[in-house]
Amino acid sequence: LMEGAIQPRISDVDLSQVLTQQLFQYYDSLSEAGIALEVELEEHLHYATDPELWERLLQNMLSNVLKHGKEQARLTLMSDADTIRVELRNIVQQPIQHLDQLASRFYSENLSDTEESSGLGLYIIQNFVEILGGDLQLATEADWFVLTITLKK
């Protein structure tokens, strides 16, 4: 993801619909992994963005839950007067040691019991969020990892 290499193609996107499609694609994998996903979704939430990047962003987020999550995850898509917020929280397999480095390129804490990680997942997510003009926040709350994307309307 070289600087300026991806130029977004902006159009009117139903964020809720694209998110729902991605959830259907990941449903079986999440179920097989024993991860119960709770979803809170504002319907017909439209936003001027790149539909392909939005889709790839969601795929990376859900893939991250599959690799590093366990038992429970919650996905929220909501808006207020000024912003649209996507929040994905999941219980982690291993405690997170260096939250501030998680989105660094090639950094991995090997938080997964089963899989080697390239350390690119959150780095890619951060880059997509920046390309789309949004803000990415990462946090931990007890056993939970919380990823929040804020897009300005």
Q: What do these predicted regions represent?
A:
Residues 94-107:
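Short conserved segment of the HATPase_c
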Residues 54-58:
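A residue-level detector for a conserved hydrophobic packing site
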Residues 72-82:
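Short beta-strand/loop element within the Bergerat-fold HATPase_c
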Residues 3-8, 46-49:
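Conserved micro-motifs of the catalytic ATP-binding
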Residues 9-11, 36-45:
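Conserved catalytic submotifs in the C-terminal HATPase_c
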